[in-house]
Amino acid sequence: MVLSLTGNSVGSGQTYQWQESTTIGGPFTNIGASSNSSVLNILASTTKYYQCEVTCSGNSQLSTPVLVTVNPSFPGGNYTINSALPTSGSNFQTFNDFKNALNCGIAGAIVVNVVAGSGPYNEQVEFGEITGVSSVNTITINGNGNVLTYGATVSTAPGTLVLNGTDYMTVNNLTVEGTGTTYALVCHLWNNADNNTFSNCTFNAPVNGTSTSMVPFSISGSATSGTASGNSGINNVITGCTMFSGYYNTAIVGNSSLPSTGNQVINCNILDQYNYATYFLYQNGLVFRGNTLSRPTRTNLSTYYGIYLSTGNTNALVERNKIRNTFATNPTSTSIQYSIYCTIDATLGNENKFSNNVISDINSNGTVYGFYMSGSDYWKAYHNTISLDDASSTATGTTYGFYCTGSLAYDVRNNIVSISRGGTGTKYDVYYSNPSAATSDYNDLYMNASAGTNNIGYNGTAYTTLAAWQSGSGKDANSVSVDPLYVAPGTYDYTPSNGLVNDAGTPVGVTDDINGAPRSLTSPDMGAYEFSLGGLDAGITWFTPTSPSSPGLKTITVNIDNTQAQTINSIQLSYSDGGAPVVQTFTGLGLTSGNNTNLSFTTQYN
């Protein structure tokens, strides 16, 4: 509290002595020593009267006493928010009534339950800095499925639920909506809002909204922008939430001079944004885990940025995420897709890490990047599955599994890249413009597109086969190029069933898979899923011809026997006459245990 005088005359040599008393009649006691300034900063903890003794040339005068009432901190305990009841000692009729009760701080942990079915609550709520909060004295809001909604109309106040410097708040099971036609920072944290948790909440921006001021969830350095840098927040956790629509869907931006630490987005659904599914800047140690990113219902579509990491990101852990179904309502769109976008240089020992992610079901006619790592150094991509297999596409643009133009130290191992996308555009499993920077090995680089110029790899020269790529680049010596034979891609199950990618990886420190299943510590599987053939095996009983019998083309037939318990539905066979192998996948077999069948190659042997 600041004490000062108004209406007094000022002269040389005056001194000021502030005094306090519990009653207006005194006695008053001095607060510290006298000063030549009339301004005094004090901490007021109880209600008292204050006056100032002004002395000039030995003469003293007293100011009129002023009563300063100090409200006590809000007591810890359990409370309710219920619009059907008036605000009282234990209930608050609105969220703002609850917020106002915290203005003088808290004296203990607070739990407030929004009574089920008591909403919706149509109000704009901004919590500020709350004294007394700590890791023990927390504030918990249990939404119980209620809706907090607001239609912002001005750029200076675009939020519905705002945490302005608020710490140690937990919000559970609350739906928050922004319905403004231009402004909708639905849930927005800024100004050093730290140590907050949002669990099982839903944050909705307007359907098909395109304004850059529409962001379902944001942490930034500005009251009015979801993507501005500055003092934003650290150690915030968003878990089990759904973020819907927006221009940006989920944005976390720190301070350019001191990046934010400890922010996490875990097991969330990030849906139907116009442009950026995520937008991360100036973060150290960001965790982005177990999230599903898609655009299943949005009808107006633009360029798709999935996981976007740019300036100031180091030590990011991006794992177990699924990016899929991003052009569901317009598969003929020619907009570009950047599934994972990273344009930042980390440093040695502070690499950004990408593991156990699945990119699939990208049904469009535009250029597609699985990993877009433009000018990005010091990163690691392990055990990712990239399936760019939309055979109905007519794309003329390029398709990339990995697009990498960094010049220092990046590592691509144990990944599956399968491309059978239609269209006449050029395709690459891996594209390294500075190959000396790349460690690339133990990958499945499968190319089976029906049209276009199709390449396994690029290092300044394009190579159409794995053997040529290995010889020409010196990369991927232990890699394979086989159809992964995904178990059920129609239901997003991209577990391989091809034994040639089983146990074919190398240990890189990723000890579990996308589902949390433990990986082999010596021979992990390629791709995001650790799997076992588990009673699935076949033997070759016989094949013909076994030797040249006469000149001319001959059909090679192989008799396959199911030697294990599981039914064999598909199998991949190959033969070679000393040149490039002829590979064919046979599907729809239905070969049960103990039975055999004849399989004939369509490409004849000469």
Where are these regions (language model features)?
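Acidic Gly/Asp/Thr-rich repetitive segments characteristic of extracellular carbohydrate-active
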Residues: 77-115, 120, 126, 467-469, ...
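Extracellular beta-strand-rich solenoid/capping regions of secreted or surface-exposed proteins
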Residues: 122-140, 147-172, 177-194, 211-227, ...
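Solvent-exposed loop segments of extracellular immunoglobulin-like
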Residues: 8-17
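Short glycine/acidic-rich loop motifs that flank beta-strands on beta-rich extracellular proteins
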Residues: 124, 150-159, 179-186, 206-217, ...
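Right-handed parallel beta-helix
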Residues: 142-143, 167-178, 194-206, 226-245, ...
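Surface-exposed, flexible coil segments in extracellular/virion-facing regions
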Residues: 19-42, 586
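Extracellular/luminal regions of secreted and cell-surface proteins that mediate adhesion/ECM remodeling
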Residues: 533-606
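C-terminal accessory segments
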Residues: 439-449, 463-530
